[in-house]
């Protein structure tokens, strides 16, 4: 994503959630953030995005994915009792992440992987080998668009599938979010997923605050009454 597009999205997220004072309770005091504070959060968001090498998704797009029941994994990184149990994006799993990468413990990383891996899409991988064939067979296979090759010494081969097996698809769409645009928990978890080789990771910057402010439905964890 181009830098100006990241800036535009970050600004849009900041302004869209800025109408709710609760969103910025952990970052600013007062009903409206100062322009200097908005600038700091915006550029910090941009720098995190560049460093994390993940993609970004806005509220409307995520809402469309949820409504369309897209195949994806949504990760809420907020503490369970304080946030996730009360409200979360429908279908989201909960794996808590800290505000900085240095504070991300081995147990927290393991918890994220333990929950994500079983939910990944599956894909079939083919193990192939080049098998020697006659010139006649080579021509026949080539006409049928099979993968073939001919060596300089006129030895003919075709690519034969010797084994098929199913593996987890690391290109599965994964969306990570936390509380609001100034919250770095989602950055920490999203950046970690990218480092683990996942290639389709999105950070939902506005988080649960933007989701709720947009009037979207939420799920919650029902706790038994005493």
Regions of interest found by a model, annotated:
Residues 46-53, 99-106, 162, 179-181, ...:
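Second-shell loop/turn segments in exported
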